[in-house]
Design a protein with these regions (language model features):
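NTP/phosphate- and nucleic-acid-binding module
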Residues: 1-403
């Protein structure tokens, strides 16, 4: 069983490189441990995840405010919150601070110490007052951010799971102290709902109540949502009750405009790691079956997550009449409607199908000689391999109904 699981990770890593999802960082110079570069389809997948998250938790709500804070912050931010003293992992019997330190300034006497942020949360807390002053929100309300974070991990490993540079999607949701348990449960349900919607296998999700000494120094309650990775059951996302720790650390408060009451809100924090989300979605989507006497690998993405919705292919790329029809009457039509449409005329049609299966493209559309006479095309389904003849005029609706 362990050998099969290791083999699955090898297949995922190999597919990601072969199909242009993810590459080792600085690969032509031997790489750099804990870093990865994103190829064309990896960027598309990651952007789909981020856009869906932002739409669900920001655009579709009236109590959420976005922010995009600077990666470099005044070092006093990290001193105030205890990160300089406490953000550490054990190493050789000592505590090793995993924040990446840097210097700002050109002249020696003006150089200031700063850090590459180890989390995106503080960028929201230091903008709490700005957000309240600008928008006058009523409790409960939240702030949301998507951005890079950095940690000097002692032992980066397991592909995207543990890296030194990664991306987070975080929410800080501000509530009254007496309401924290209600909203903790609310955000737990919201997180589980989002996981299912993006195509994570919910049979592989487990909730772990993190015990006192295992929790971060700012948390009074934490749940880890663990995923059954090939290398074991490990944290995917987290939900924390940060109490009033951060706002109190920054000496920030909130005045209720209705009764002029001054309070320090408490915070519920749903945290989503994008890189781990990508890995969980890839592992959930990866399937193999038998087609034409051969083993076929394909990524069964939800259409909303798929880097490509459909691939358009002229049956023969050396036949100008097929190429022209495919380009003008099919590709241009679908590209304008769906955006995530690509042109594929490389290799025979069987190889194109296999390539698009590994990319996770739900539909392949082939323009052949019959198309020139009856204005129909072959639409091939990724999951079943079945093919249908569809009128070009019906293509948009056909695809729209299935995504």
């Amino acid at each position: 069983m362990e050998k099969e699981e290791n083999n699955l990770m090898e297949k995922i890593v190999s597919l990601c490189k072969r199909r242009g999802f993810i590459f080792s960082g600085s690969e032509i110079y031997g790489g750099l441990a804990g870093t990865y570069d994103w190829g064309h389809f990896g960027v598309a997948l990651k952007n789909n995840i981020k856009q869906y998250w932002w739409k669900k938790f920001v655009d579709n709500r009236r109590d959420m405010y976005g922010v995009d804070a600077a990666i470099l912050m005044n070092s006093k931010v990290w001193e105030a919150t205890g990160h300089v003293a406490n953000f550490a992992d054990p190493l050789d019997g000592k505590q090793f601070n995993t924040m990446l330190k840097t210097q700002i300034g050109a002249k020696k006497e003006e150089v200031a110490v700063s850090y590459l942020r180890p989390e995106t949360a503080q960028g929201m807390f230091v903008n709490f007052k700005n957000t309240v002053d600008a928008f006058h929100p009523k409790l409960p309300f939240g702030m949301a951010q998507i951005g890079k974070a950095f940690r000097n991990e002692i032992a980066p490993r397991d592909f995207l799971f543990r890296q030194r540079e990664f991306e987070q999607m975080e929410i800080e949701y501000f509530v009254r102290k007496e309401d924290w348990e209600k909203y903790f449960e609310y955000w737990k349900d919201e997180m589980l709902s989002w996981m299912e919607e993006v195509g994570i296998d919910m049979n592989k999700i487990h909730e772990l109540e993190v015990l006192g000494e295992e929790r971060a120094h700012y948390s009074k309650r934490t749940i880890d949502f663990e995923f059954d990775y090939p290398f074991g059951k490990k944290e995917l996302f987290g939900l924390a009750y940060r109490t009033d720790f951060d706002l109190k650390s920054h000496k920030l408060d909130y005045i209720d405009e209705e009764n002029t009451e001054k309070i320090i809100p408490h915070v519920i924090e749903p945290t989503f790691g994008i890189d781990r989300a990508v890995l969980a979605i890839l592992l959930s989507a990866y399937h193999e079956d038998q087609k034409g006497g051969e083993t076929r690998a394909y990524l069964k993405f939800k259409p909303s997550m798929a880097p490509v919705i459909c691939a358009v292919s002229p049956l023969l790329k050396n036949k100008p009449e097929l190429v022209e029809y495919a380009n003008i009457k099919v590709f241009a039509l679908l590209k304008a409607e769906f955006g995530r449409v690509i042109w594929d005329d490389n290799g025979n049609i069987g190889k194109r199908y296999r390539r698009q299966d590994e990319i996770g493209t739900p539909f392949c559309i082939v323009i052949d000689f019959d198309t020139l006479t009856d204005d129909t095309v072959t639409v091939r389904d990724r999951d079943t391999g079945e093919q249908e003849r569809i009128k070009v005029t019906d293509l948009k609706k056909y695809i729209q109904d299935r995504i």
